[in-house]
Amino acid sequence: MSEKEELPLTLTSIGAATATSDYHQRVGSSGEGISSSSSDVDPRFMQNSPTGLMISQSSSMCTVPPGMAATPPISSGSGLSQQLNNSSSSKLCQVEGCQKGARDASGRCISHGGGRRCQKPDCQKGAEGKTVYCKAHGGGRRCEYLGCTKGAEGSTDFCIAHGGGRRCNHEDCTRSAWGRTEFCVKHGGGARCKTYGCGKSASGPLPFCRAHGGGKKCSHEDCTGFARGRSGLCLMHGGGKRCQRENCTKSAEGLSGLCISHGGGRRCQSIGCTKGAKGSKMFCKACITKRPLTIDGGGNMGGVTTGDALNYLKAVKDKFEDSEKYDTFLEVLNDCKHQGVDTSGVIARLKDLFKGHDDLLLGFNTYLSKEYQITILPEDDFPIDFLDKVEGPYEMTYQQAQTVQANANMQPQTEYPSSSAVQSFSSGQPQIPTSAPDSSLLAKSNTSGITIIEHMSQQPLNVDKQVNDGYNWQKYGQKKVKGSKFPLSYYKCTYLGCPSKRKVERSLDGQVAEIVYKDRHNHEPPNQGKDGSTTYLSGSSTHINCMSSELTASQFSSNKTKIEQQEAASLATTIEYMSEASDNEEDSNGETSEGEKDEDEPEPKRRITEVQVSELADASDRTVREPRVIFQTTSEVDNLDDGYRWRKYGQKVVKGNPYPRFSSSKDYDVVIRYGRADISNEDFISHLRASLCRRGISVYEKFNEVDALPKCRVLIIVLTSTYVPSNLLNILEHQHTEDRVVYPIFYRLSPYDFVCNSKNYERFYLQDEPKKWQAALKEITQMPGYTLTDKSESELIDEIVRDALKVLCSADKVNMIGMDMQVEEILSLLCIESLDVRSIGIWGTVGIGKTTIAEEIFRKISVQYETCVVLKDLHKEVEVKGHDAVRENFLSEVLEVEPHVIRISDIKTSFLRSRLQRKRILVILDDVNDYRDVDTFLGTLNYFGPGSRIIMTSRNRRVFVLCKIDHVYEVKPLDIPKSLLLLDRGTCQIVLSPEVYKTLSLELVKFSNGNPQVLQFLSSIDREWNKLSQEVKTTSPIYIPGIFEKSCCGLDDNERGIFLDIACFFNRIDKDNVAMLLDGCGFSAHVGFRGLVDKSLLTISQHNLVDMLSFIQATGREIVRQESADRPGDRSRLWNADYIRHVFINDTGTSAIEGIFLDMLNLKFDANPNVFEKMCNLRLLKLYCSKAEEKHGVSFPQGLEYLPSKLRLLHWEYYPLSSLPKSFNPENLVELNLPSSCAKKLWKGKKARFCTTNSSLEKLKKMRLSYSDQLTKIPRLSSATNLEHIDLEGCNSLLSLSQSISYLKKLVFLNLKGCSKLENIPSMVDLESLEVLNLSGCSKLGNFPEISPNVKELYMGGTMIQEIPSSIKNLVLLEKLDLENSRHLKNLPTSIYKLKHLETLNLSGCISLERFPDSSRRMKCLRFLDLSRTDIKELPSSISYLTALDELLFVDSRRNSPVVTNPNANSTELMPSESSKLEILGTPADNEVVVGGTVEKTRGIERTPTILVKSREYLIPDDVVAVGGDIKGLRPPVLQLQPAMKLSHIPRGSTWDFVTHFAPPETVAPPSSSSEAREEEVETEETGAMFIPLGDKETCSFTVNKGDSSRTISNTSPIYASEGSFITCWQKGQLLGRGSLGSVYEGISADGDFFAFKEVSLLDQGSQAHEWIQQVEGGIALLSQLQHQNIVRYRGTTKDESNLYIFLELVTQGSLRKLYQRNQLGDSVVSLYTRQILDGLKYLHDKGFIHRNIKCANVLVDANGTVKLADFGLAKVMSLWRTPYWNWMAPEVILNPKDYDGYGTPADIWSLGCTVLEMLTGQIPYSDLEIGTALYNIGTGKLPKIPDILSLDARDFILTCLKVNPEERPTAAELLNHPFVNMPLPSSGSGSVSSLLRG
């Protein structure tokens, strides 16, 4: 019942009658009252009803009280009192519990309403209770507003305060207002504002409050709609939408999607077009991209600007042979640009410029055709073949078309319709055309494929239409606006290029209908006259003159492909209805107008069978006639398939765009074919389609019979007893050639019945051979399919979906280069078989391939899950739609319901849990970059059923932590070979040679760091690779799509500022220094570092450097560049020298500049004194020179007046002024760095006093003024309370140091090295934080200063100090004491032994020092002791207590010999009750003395300090004597020679001479000369081992006992001692190391000669032992002939039953590997070693030997730094997999492991490159890879990682050695000329190589 029919509530005479209140009548009303949609009302007033209706909580019935007699209705009039009196009685009040008497017929007392009437006008009912209204009008009811207890007002459900009694304010609405609002429910009352975060009530019909636009009218002209949001505009005019232009935040204007500044609200300037302009152009998108635009004398040109011409002109600069003409062109166009010449003027200039340059005109036309589909033609004659070269449609004038025809030697075939014909077209009467011309309509055609149309003269239109006054009138709402002027004449030429489609376009004013002929086989249209001049339309007598001349195929040979690809069209003549409805058709880009339904499937086609032209107005008004289209029956319309979309607009049907042709790529996943009339239950098809769609499968459902099928992976054919596809033969014929699976479904019949009922399908093959059809029917029954007879349809559908998913998931995977391994690793983490709910996070930088990997995983495993949900670009979706909407969409997909059914506020947790716990779900959340994006999902994910998996991708690792993801997988970048696959050479192959291309490719790959998105961008960029390579090297700003937009996405202000600072200034700088500066700038550095690392934008290297990938750094710099592309002075950060120079010289700096880093190399210019005055926000200033030897820079001839007070960093090398500016306030300065400056004082006069007395230096932490030669003193630093670092090295004019330095409690580092005029040092006892103090070179410093006890490193070399006070013992934390070249130092206190933490003591050059203190105390930590060039003549006995000593240098200053060192690298604590004491033993008779000692037993290893003796400048191998070892018992005090052995001459100054001279006399005993004494001595030895002499036979056996084992030794080849004598007997010593062939031990002969031998087990060789021994012995025989200073000499072999022994020269310093493990090797040391290795390799290669095993472990070092190649030549007889040599193997060795003749000396060069890399980095190449991966990488040519921190020469040397092609590697002789090998050595004062060993 409607509102107008509502009646007041009355009591009927029926006993229990009920009546519905006014309010509840509205609830029950279907069309009015309160809406049944829950979205229109406040949820607080909703109850849990299944329909979602709002049910009132008050009673909806009014019932007569019990016991009350039924009475007739109370009526008005004079009989009212009588009725009441008659009904009154002595009855009690009917209210329960009331004992009062009833007042009247109401049955109630006065207190309960008896006797009182309702106060509602015209209401005669009794009041209810104590209220003044009856029950129907609110009496007795309470306000339903939440929490309100007042009575309802009137017939409403609310009190007066909450809307009761008030009416809706919406226009003529008479409903009651809802709640506190001024509107009813229908018009917004009770609803909440939908603005995110707003909780106010909606105001007006839209769900927005007044603050957000509710109730406001649109402010756009005469619009009557309601405003949306805060915009003040309705949705039609852009309200609630933002401008789509990037970085624009203004509201969109109208439907354009753009603000007014970017084109919104403006109309297209094309004649006849009423659409809005697109962007900043003057035309809509359709006029720019859909049809060609006009260029004529009227100046109507579509969007071509002077800038377009300038861009093209600059691009073709090289094509101008005359540079002056190019300059003229450029000057003309620039004048046009600056003078603001209009479009017509620009066109005129362009035509003049391109005269005589047809090639440039053609190129410019091609450029414009691609951008705007516009073509400019010259005014004069032009070649006929020009039209064939122009791409796309073009336009020309009528005169130009005549020129084309004349050049083609053709006469135009012209038909001129008479005026009567035109009149007949207007009136609709049939007329026969004549040949008389009419000026109102001119149509010409020719056979050259060009159609020329001249518009009719402008005709006046009706007022409702368009006024024809020569201007384009546009209608906007109720207003008409005068537009642009029509051109006086317009000729349009369309180059169609297809003989099957001839088109005549209507005139721009819409007065001519468009006629289209479609003929697949070039047949004549139906009902066409034989003369070809007139076409009569079917069903109508109306005729229109048109062109029917056929176009020859030869004229369109270039378009042959297009002709073949055209779809067959039905042979009919159609007319396009050109009306305003065409504006609603879809544009070519797929956009649809508002309100139009965007359908996935094409609508049914409709055939036009009759065209009638109806008269719209009287003919005398000269109005236009519109064609009205009439159709046949629906069945015939449905069967129409002419390739075009037909849309219905009211009663009209309009021909739309053609259907898209199916491309060669897959268009659909599944196509379903069925007969619509044959399926009795259409629900089966709909359920099947819905099930497929829920699994993310694209489905094309087709019941019409068409020949062409879209490409698909699965084709489902539903076969019935009466249906089979008409193209079944075609389907089966292409079944084996197409990648498609066909599944037949036999619907309600078996396959047997299907074949038996073949007679029912005769109608399909009446025209074909029955045998083929019978075979086809039989074949389809044998194909895998489904039969639906008694089976449940739901089960069958599930089975079909599963099989379809298997087929789709087995499709060809995307070519993911380098991702397969990572996909498998993630799948192993997912553990699909497990039943737990597991989540995986995929983490990596932007563009690394996270989404691609997730999609591939989804493709692989989605078939195993019941429900799969993929949310792509989740962060963006949340930003656009909001959290609630995204979660509702997510739940709708998981629960498989429609999105509008789910409401977050309505759904219950228990319902979710119960539904989801029964599902096995796969969820992929892509691009989750904020925890808040998935915060609402987290609880839902916990409800998933067993076996569910959640995969989340993000750039932010912290998201995974907050979301409590089980496993996080970091995506790895591509390696070099796979990265190179993504780079496309393109045109570079023509220009670049393979070598140059390879070099550039590697540079680009290094820049990309294996990021696929960056590599794809670099491969597609159109810049030359040479220029691009230079940009990459200098990390210039580069815009990388996708990377640029997402780099700063999600960064807060702190992280963004740190990110840009590092990208521009601080990349690969020490983290602590960067953090110090950033903290001083107000950033939270460590928090920002952590955030950037989590977001994959930054890494912290193992050397504590902040490291940013090159492409991310380039992107960050591009962000800064785009702050102001044209004005560098408006950017926040400057680092480019050219830009900075421009800013300095032209004084264009602004307050926007925050940082300047200028490399002054090759720069020299003058700047004005106030160059920094405008840069008030400058906080980082660094002027430096990258090459120290080049001194250039900025000079200030007039001085410097200003520096910004906000500076945190002032780094200025070669500062040219004597002091800082007076106006400079350093209150914010964190680092002051002025090395090599001309400053004499930092501040002058009052400024100096101000800085020292105030807290202006409170933030200063680092001050460096090194090598400032003119600096005489530094100011007081008492205010710099946070100063931590002071560097005054090289300030040789500095006279004194201020006493204020003692107040610097936080000072850690103080360097005064080279301050030669400094005499006194203030007390530093109170510097409690001081750790490093360097006073070296303070040559006038004579007193030992008072130093803080916390100092760890003290350098005092080169001073005048004579003695070290005993108070040095107070420096309990001292680790290093350097007193080198302290020539006046005479003695050291014994208290020096109390320095328990001292590790290094350098006394080299202390020539006055005569003795080293002797003490029984142990210095357990001392590892290095340098006593060279001192006057110490004898080592104290306490030297043996230095148990941790690794190296001891000792030189006799009088005789310049010898040096004593201890090379052991490691030491451990002595076991209890064990001791170690060094002893020196010898024989004074013949000076044969050895250094001996007891064995030191330690935990885990056995070690004995070894003393190496150097006798001259070079090292003689025979002079090396080693001590100790794994020999049981003590060695004899004197090792004697056998009488038969040859005794070599002992030169003076040799080892023996040295030990004899320095050893204590008591340790030297006379030797025994008789053999008997020697034998007796040996027999009484307690070692358990015996020296057994070998006889004269070839072999001899002897036994060596060691524990419980014994073995017999037999000599197989002569073993030579160091002096050429035979070794007749020997003893095994300590283990030196283990190699690939066996273990290496120290050996000692009976004559005291030490050597090394390799013990190789013969048992490992099996049955091939004998053959293998022969090969080894033959190799050793050859190797023993080699004599070179850089090659370890082989001395011979011997063997026993189980082992082979190979004897070699003993080199005692150890291998290069042990050396770099102990010390970091510098470039100069590695260069020295490399040159010696090359010397040895050259010698070997010249002799025809190949080392085959070059690595640091096989390169031994002597005490003087001489290297010797060892362990070579034997790799040939070893298996590849048995040796760990693969880290250094060359690719050809990997590829041919057993073909030793397949590679040669270049293999050694590759190994040498790896060895040099190992020495420089301290890491074995490929050590981070497994052996299989490493071998694969080497075999494929992937180089090991080469750090960027290496020098250029070192990198070049390594890359030169690591050429993949062996033929490209240089020889060892060629490498000896490389700059890296010839690097000069550092100076060494002592002449010792120990300094080199320390690097």
UniProtKB/Swiss-Prot annotation:
PAH domain span: 291-371
- Which part of the chain is the Protein kinase domain? 1626-1877
Q: Name one Pfam family in it.
A: PAH
This entry carries the following GO cellular component terms, namely:
chloroplast envelope; nucleus
Task: Provide the alphabetized UniProt keywords.
Answer: ATP-binding, DNA-binding, Kinase, Leucine-rich repeat, Nucleotide-binding, Nucleus, Plant defense, Repeat, Serine/threonine-protein kinase, Transcription, Transcription regulation, Transferase
Q: What spans are recorded as compositionally biased (Polar residues)?
A: 10-22, 46-62, 408-417, 428-442
Please tell me whether the keyword Nucleotide-binding is annotated for this protein.
yes
Q: Which GO terms describe its biological process?
A: defense response; signal transduction
**Primary location class:** nucleus
Q: Which family does this protein fall into?
A: Belongs to the disease resistance X-TIR-NB-LRR-X family.
The entry's protein name is Probable WRKY transcription factor 19
Q: What would be the name of the gene that encodes this protein?
A: WRKY19
